[in-house]
Amino acid sequence: MKWKKYTIETTTAAEDFMSSMLMELGIEGIEIEDNIPLTKEDQADMFIDFLPELPPDEGISHVSFYIEDDGSDQSDMLRKVKLGLEDLRDTVDVGSGVISSSETEDLDWINNWKKYFSSFTIGDILIKPTWEEVKPEDADKFMIEIDPGISFGTGKHETTQLCIKQLIKYIEGAKEAPTVLDVGCGSGILSIVALKLGAKEVVGTDLDADCMISTRDNMQVNHLDEKLGTFYVGNLIDDTELQKKVGTEKYDIVVANILADVIIPMAPVIPDRLKEGGYFITSGIIDFKENEVKEAIEAAGLKVIEINHQGEWVNITAQKLTK
């Protein structure tokens, strides 16, 4: 299926008026591009480690919308858009108001990413996408299959690999099968690795409800009993009901492959989740945030026992010492 993309050059002052006008005409799927700087509140809400530098804001905005290119005459719709644009001139500076057009394919965005995800190994563990066959040379490896679906997490990212290496170390080295809390479980890859390595129970949390579906599906693909995993939607940082559901002093390992700006405010709630002697394994930490995360973990009362690097990413492992 093809789509016509129409882009209106306007001003940042008019972009909201323009969007409202298009929606009143029944047009959905509106896209706004501008260089308005983000506020500190916006940046905090985004939970990202660094922002790309934007060009200077010159007050120009591009408002785009899409109409299915089914061969029908679109001139009437465009006429209404142009009339609406002219009406707005009485209210706000709409700038040039020039409308340009282009064609775009209806790409299968849910599946196109698959060409970038292929099998890889971490030690003796083979992590492969569900749609890929096992290569003969990998037939004797310990296999985990993952289909992230529309949730985040194939396992190939350095931060996930750092966490997996630590899970291998601390689960295989445990005297008894551990219980694991996976914060920000995503596709469930770390929960599944933990269970495959011998964890007796996994609890996972994520802000995205779609992750619950992906995690359950991936557990089934890996022939894991669903009773071994319990998963909740919510924010462990400040959701007291979720904290009650997750429990206190219950876990031998808490693993969190999330961003530094999430780990820092989350650190104070981790000690209460861990048993004495339990481990907090975390990554998703860009290198220039290492000290800040380390200080937050130590301030929460945990002892940092190991720091590992892979590329520009960092793993910090800490322990809750016995009293």
UniProtKB/Swiss-Prot annotation:
Methylates ribosomal protein L11. NCBIfam families: prmA (TIGR00406). It comes from Agathobacter rectalis (strain ATCC 33656 / DSM 3377 / JCM 17463 / KCTC 5835 / VPI 0990). Keywords: Cytoplasm, Methyltransferase, S-adenosyl-L-methionine, Transferase. PANTHER family: ELECTRON TRANSFER FLAVOPROTEIN BETA SUBUNIT LYSINE METHYLTRANSFERASE. GO terms for cellular component: cytoplasm. Its EC number is 2.1.1.-. Its main location: cytoplasm. It comes from the Bacteria. GO terms for molecular function: protein-lysine N-methyltransferase activity. The gene is prmA. Belongs to the methyltransferase superfamily. PrmA family. GO terms for biological process: methylation. This is Ribosomal protein L11 methyltransferase. It is found in: Cytoplasm. The keyword Plastid does not apply. It catalyses: L-lysyl-[protein] + 3 S-adenosyl-L-methionine = N(6),N(6),N(6)-trimethyl-L-lysyl-[protein] + 3 S-adenosyl-L-homocysteine + 3 H(+). The keyword Transferase applies.
